[in-house]
């Protein structure tokens, strides 16, 4: 049953991503989600049955098609369409304003990376998160993992603030007054230790600046962790050379 839920959840997410890339608003889909939760007396979407998730996914599909943005059946057409959307994003008002403020040429264009996807929404032993390798409140030189993660969700859910998230470390939970038993360090110790090891390697061994790391894990074992992106923390003053 969980695999059916997973399949329909991904179908739902695909419909929403495609629709939003074509100009639909997140609220268009959130309204459908809220209505569906209310109809089935559900608080968290992970509590939908596979059939209920199927119904919601098809509602998303209908909403996208009603706006003229239906997804083509041919996977190759889907891929080419997705690539074209990324290219077109270079010309959005937000992107143009950013380039103007940052002094970036309009002639550069953008690249498109096509890669395999990993799934934080596989089940209750999977999840996604964002962490910082430096303490946000105290000036300490050691690596200290700080951030948020969610179980059974994708990274976009966390970044958008759509789901209830939990602290990364026990130290963070104690300082923030949150439940340390829900921290990644307590619930998924193998994942936490692997992230700590990677963070120390980047900061101590490679001498990178403090990092902001996005990650997904498809299971509770260390080898099921995937680093999606890492970049310099913008809240930390970079080292002077």
Whereabouts are the PLM-identified features?
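Nucleotide/phosphate-binding sheet-loop regions of phosphoryl- and nucleotidyl-transfer enzymes
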Residues: 1-241
